[in-house]
Amino acid sequence: MSAIDKHAVKQFLMSLQDSICQQLEQEDGKAVFVEDAWQREKGERLGGGGRTRVLRDGHIFEQGGVNFSHVEGNEMPASATAHRPELAGRRFEAMGVSLVIHPKNPYVPTSHANVRFFIAEKDGEDPIWWFGGGFDLTPFYPFDEDCQSWHDTAKQLCAPFGDEVYPEHKAWCDKYFFLPHRNETRGVGGLFFDDLNQWEFDKCFDYIKAVGEGYCQAYLPIVSRRKDIEFGEREREFQLYRRGRYVEFNLVYDRGTLFGLQSGGRTESILMSMPPLARWEYSYEPQTGSPEAELYERYLTPREW
């Protein structure tokens, strides 16, 4: 088995944060990320620190956050040990890059990506470790061309790791980003995986690199194609309404959000994924035959691209 190299993972994640921020700033052309570096105080339940970077009021991006964090603790939170009882009583480290981008233009999809590494150690025993992550796309006015190119990029980056990887991680994404109380997916999916340790460490690490670097390759061409489409109040209102689904998912179902809040994580960083504005409307129904109705009819159930 290849050696576990926590330092190399951390260095990659920090450089990935830098690279993604630079590419998004370049695409936006106006806004820049403002960094909020943070460190946990000694004696807190969770140690460590991170770099939260937030961009606001750009030409294209209304708000976006790209967060790096590296935290450690002596005891796992309940959300983690519930499905992994062997982690109880182990000290742990968790590090990752997580980002959500909320564009202004309703024709530009919202996007999310995350890559992370987790290790739990106990003296005299082998460490328990895994990688997780993925990326997913949430359009409000979808184009088949965009969904296809998003998934093509995902397929291509998965291919060197095995023919089964894309279909498995694509299906996992469809299942994970699903709102049971709405009976709809959050968007058109992408990749999602967790507990990745079935390969040697180096291969798992290489896959994480491919996913992290593949995010901008998948997303920025879509932004470029849609950023100049004209829109009015109707499209903006629908965008804000659909952003409400993002809020519902993150606060009710997202394991990362629950893990962060239960383990005493940094609330501002955990909730940076929230849209700056969202709205709810009682018993909303899209008009038959409208572009809004098409989202519901064609894009909010899992499909092959």
From Swiss-Prot:
It catalyses: coproporphyrinogen III + O2 + 2 H(+) = protoporphyrinogen IX + 2 CO2 + 2 H2O. The record marks 181 as: Important for dimerization. Pathway: Porphyrin-containing compound metabolism; protoporphyrin-IX biosynthesis; protoporphyrinogen-IX from coproporphyrinogen-III (O2 route): step 1/1. It is found in: Cytoplasm. Substrate binds at residues 98, 114-116, 264-266. Gene3D superfamilies: Coproporphyrinogen III oxidase, aerobic. Its EC number is 1.3.3.3. Pfam families: Coprogen_oxidas. A divalent metal cation binds at residues 102, 112, 151, 181. Belongs to the aerobic coproporphyrinogen-III oxidase family. This is Oxygen-dependent coproporphyrinogen-III oxidase. The lineage of its organism: Bacteria, Pseudomonadati, Pseudomonadota, Gammaproteobacteria, Vibrionales.
